[in-house]
Amino acid sequence: TGETFEENAITKASVPAKLGYIGIADDSGLCVSALNEAPGVYSARYSGGDDEDNNDLLLKELENKTDRSAKYVCVMACVFPDHQNDFTVRGECHGEILKERHGTAGFGYDPLFYYQPFDKTFAEIDLAKKNEVSHRSIAIKKFVEKIKEIM
């Protein structure tokens, strides 16, 4: 694991590029302000357990914190065999971490990630609506625009 989402996405996308193909990859996670942007690149294995364990640890670490602001981050990388047009794009979705889980849809930290414009957690939002505003959808839109510029 690299130290940043950018490093990880580039590392993943570099594998096909070494074989002569265009490599496209992403890395994503949750960054919580009060925890110095943790879990960050370690989001999937924050607790060493599953999603429930990760959520439990996050709640425990935020127990006495007043600042519960957080963001989901997705970085997409495109690596070319000749490295002439390599790029990354970053999508972010800002919210806050609730004190208890709400909703059952989604995965990961979605039951704790409150998105104010919809007044719901990501686990309570319809998937189509979530896909309009998520960090991944923002990154994908930026990625498509960048590809159009290059091609």
Which residue ranges define each predicted feature?
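Anionic-ligand binding patches
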Residues: T1-M151
